[in-house]
Amino acid sequence: MNDVQKDPVCGMTVLPGRGLTASYGDQTIYFCSEYCRNKFLEKPALYLAALTTRSFAETKEHRRVAYFSVEVGVGASMPTYSGGLGVLAGDTLKSCADLRVPVVGVTLLYRKGYFDQKFDEWGGQQEGPVEWNPAHFLQLLPELAQVEIEQRTVQVRAWQYNVVGLSGYVVPLILLDTNVEGNADDDRALTDYLYGGDQKYRLAQEIVLGIGGVRMLRALGYSGVEKFHMNEGHASLLVLELLNRQKEEQPAEWDFEKVRNRCVFTTHTPVPAGHDKFEYDLVKRAMGQVVPFEIIQMLGGQERLNVTLLALNLSRYVNGVAKRHEEVSREMFPGYPINHITNGVHSWTWTCDSFKALYDRYIPGWDNDPAMLRKALSLPKDDVWAAHVEAKARLLALVKEQTGVSLSADALTIGFARRATQYKRADLVFSDMQRLLDMVRRGYPLQFVFAGKAHPRDGEGKELIRRIVAVARQTGDQIPIVYLENYDMGLARLIISGSDLWLNTPQRPLEASGTSGMKAAHNGVPSFSTLDGWWIEGCLEGQTGWAIGGQEEGAADADSVNRRDAEDLYQKLENVIAPLFYQQRQRWLDVMRQAIALNASYFNTHRMVQQYVTNAYLP
């Protein structure tokens, strides 16, 4: 840990050689961004004093909530996340730290990450392990826990990462690791890959996370935990360990109600096929006797273990992640009292440096109270545009560096960066290339920046990337299209803040929430999206952005839905959005300010965490 430094302005971990530095006296100070370095240089003594007095020492007994997630993204340099679920978990813990919510996070340590992504010349995705050293970021803890997997005792150790809030309050994140001397080779590899391996591998990981996580918290001394929050069903086996512990304390009965009162469950999946299910033959072999099999079958389903059903049956508070997602989830699981708390993003993390400086100047205090961003309606338009031009220049410089393609600073730049999977319909905008070429000939230049990984076993997702790369080769300079490699949080920040328009085209109702448009709004970038997930709540047509199609779902076939949505996309792009961007800049700036004031001020994790505290943690 000697090589790890803390940014004195925001508290983020900085690895020497990757961040920025400044000299102060005889010290070298490290920063995660140019913005933080500039803020430090304004008042160096103040920030150094804050760094040395931060409250790292709150006792473990005071932690009241344990937040479990199979992936957590706290920074681009730690590959313990793959996409939206993990980034949301990281943003949640950051807001908990800012708001001083007594939470401890639990996840797995992925020594080889999700995967490192490269493309061949045709857009074929090639995967490799991510090389990183946990000791550069984390503190290894001495305690061990044990789980039984296929009648073997597997030792689990823990690493700790401190998520430091803007006030200095610390939320510890515990990362579980089976790479322990004495474990069998296969067991040591259980925490190597995120979403890797087969069903057997995935179930073993969920045993380590859910059962091992509860046991590790106990070993570490987190004795005051009152609520266990499962962020998606991967952690649901923790309810079995809670039942087991409850039975040890009260041998006369299985107290389902007492366990239920301690559990909170957030579901993120809008389709039945997305919920993990395991054959009971595998469950019996892998899990052993945490609780009697008939109890698992009673709570998790008769034919197979459905981890979502297990969590639903033993959680007092259950929620989807958007209003529409609540409705979809109630249809999937009738009879369960499913609520909704719409997702958000961590405002400080996802606001680029130029907009941070803008908000600091005109809306001081916004960082720890993002609701204040509603005041953005009065931001000077010239300053908003200058901040955007700076963000766009950073994106274009990155594109040039990575691809050699020189994009225009003046052309309408459309961004699309998210997981490459079929339902996201990343190539919908290219359904009729002639329409786009006609726009360019009419004086509306367009350029596109794409990024996103396809799961290694998702052949359709990989083919989607190849199709976009093929379109890029065909259009050449007429409509520049780039697909950037190795999408992560750092790349996401640059693409989201540097685009002029944020495109999102998921097939309805398959987007549970989505958060990239919320991040765009924090940087004054309006969304252009199908009405699904959070955008049903966030879209004010022509004010915060634009909708593609209506809210109707289902059709005779997917092709007719695609044709209808593509037609609406082209109609609005060529008749409303492009003319507004090129011919009515002042009106475009109104939309930018409204996206900040109406979307960023609400769709943030500070508001979201406050709702979890009120609705889920306190009752």
Task: Report the location of each language-model feature.
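Short cysteine-rich clusters marking metal-coordination/redox-active sites
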Residues: 7
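Catalytic cores of carbohydrate-active enzymes across secretory and cytosolic contexts
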Residues: 53-619
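Short, flexible, mixed-charge glycine/proline-rich loop motifs
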Residues: 1-4
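Short linker/helix segments within small regulatory modules
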Residues: 21-28
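Conserved hydrophobic/aromatic "anchor" residues
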Residues: 30-31, 40, 47
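Short Cys/His-rich "knuckle" micro-motifs
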Residues: 17-20, 44
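Cys/His-rich metal-chelating microdomains
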Residues: 13-17, 34-35, 39
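Short, isolated positions in well-ordered beta-strands
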Residues: 14, 29, 154-156
